[in-house]
Amino acid sequence: MALKLMIQGTASSVGKSLLVAAFCRIFKQDGYRVAPFKSQNMALNSYITDEGLEIGRAQAMQAEAAGVKPSYHMNPILLKPSSDKKSQVVLRGKVYKNMSAAEYHQFKPQLLKFIKEDFDFLASQNDIVVIEGAGSPAEINLRDRDVVNMGMAEMVNAPVLLVGDIDKGGVFASIAGTLLLLKENERNRIEGVLINKFRGDIEILKPGLEMLENIVHKKVLGVVPYMDVHIDEEDGATERFYRRSTEGDIEIAVINLPHISNFTDFEPLAKVPGVKLRYVNKGERIGDCDVVIIPGTKNTIGDLQALKGYRLDKEIFEMRKKGKFIVGICGGYQILGKVIKDPGRIESTTSEIEGLGLLDVETVIENEKTTTQIKAVIRNNLPSILSPLRNIAVEGYEIHMGKSRILGDCQPFSVITHRNGEKIEVYDGCISDDGKVFGTYIHGIFENREFVREFINIVRKSKGLSPIEEIIDYKEFKEREYDKLADIVRKSIDMKKVYEIMERYKD
């Protein structure tokens, strides 16, 4: 069986996902076969595997760092919040049902079998499995049915490293408090502490580390600096929404919907020279920009109502009159249509709602969820303004619970040629007559270098700007960032001690 290492944190957003990715890349660099694992993930940012199964985006990112293909075994349970009180439960990559928090808490013991089987499968195929916890292990009201923190560590007999975030302040109290609330056998399983996101002079911190070790009787195995790495990270979502790209000739505004999903779709745009990417958050106006993007959402009807409530629909209509580019991805594509129908009340109590009406499309929400990896070709009869996009091949994935039907003479945007490796020919998306508004179900479309370059150059041409000749290859860029992440963490942590700890827990 494989060696095991589990990363738990004193709270959410302390950097567990990124550290798991770092360990995955370090072990890969050291010649080991390694896989990430998180028994239960709660996230709206998801990924579709080669088999057409849905997992958390963080585990797909960690698999990339490990140099292996993402698999549903790496994240057997995915919870996708659809409201403040309910989540869609995705079990082994497929939708199981919607549950309230109370219902799910009662259901958790039935999931142990699936979790153990999937972990054992990864352990049989790899030399090392790096496990990520969720939130904090010290949620004492949830401990009796825990399947993701200490319950998980005990199930597979994994050693635990506890991570604290010093950037927010209070790191010593959070570490000591977490250990205080754990049972003795759980404290004994924690083999070391990691201080994450440190800025400043390490010499000033050292006395505090010594005092902490004397108080909690745990060794600090490393202090990891605040890292400027550009990697898809779920915990970085809030920070990302308030971050602004540097000044540029082209400004792109992404509407931060209440239930925005797969926000990583737009990260490649931020890496394009001359592009300023920003998110329009609650209470903010769209303002002056060249492109408005309405992203995917886990609750299309609810987020359309919110968009109208914020009066952003009025601004979008003004953008349309000014001839700006308006793009919808997945749920955003549905929002751009004329009407969204939900006869089964799957998303809300509203059976029908008017869309923005910028595309001649009708969407019906259905129980069956489409989850596929796809290959597509942009259609060759796009309006002249978008002619540089014609016949460009793209790859991406679909995640949606509705089907959209083009009304009237509106033209499709692309032709899907492959779904999960099987050849097909299905139209996708829709485009306005003048080419200034288009929608697609293809997540990840902006990770296709040629498509992004030509689209940005179309926008640049509309402003009288010269074209950009080349942009970075996003996949190569991410590989460099994984290596950079691993180098920083390797230099900051006692890796010899980490290997010794894993060997002691070897089955």
Curated annotation (Swiss-Prot):
PROSITE patterns given for it?
A: GATASE_COBBQ
The entry's keywords = Cobalamin biosynthesis, Glutamine amidotransferase
Query: SUPFAM superfamilies given for it?
Result: Class I glutamine amidotransferase-like, P-loop containing nucleoside triphosphate hydrolases
GO molecular function terms listed in the Swiss-Prot or TrEMBL record: ABC-type vitamin B12 transporter activity; catalytic activity
Q: Please report the stretch or stretches of sequence annotated as the GATase cobBQ-type domain.
A: 249-451
- Active-site residues, Swiss-Prot/TrEMBL: 330, 443
* Pathway in which the depicted protein is active: Cofactor biosynthesis; adenosylcobalamin biosynthesis
Q: Which GO terms of type biological process are on file?
A: cobalamin biosynthetic process
Q: What does this protein do?
A: Catalyzes amidations at positions B, D, E, and G on adenosylcobyrinic A,C-diamide. NH(2) groups are provided by glutamine, and one molecule of ATP is hydrogenolyzed for each amidation.
Q: Which NCBIfam families match?
A: cobQ (TIGR00313), PRK00784.1 (NF001989)
So what family is this one in? Belongs to the CobB/CobQ family. CobQ subfamily.
- Know the name of this protein? Cobyric acid synthase
Species for this entry: Thermoanaerobacter sp. (strain X514)
Print the organism lineage.
Bacteria, Bacillati, Bacillota, Clostridia, Thermoanaerobacterales
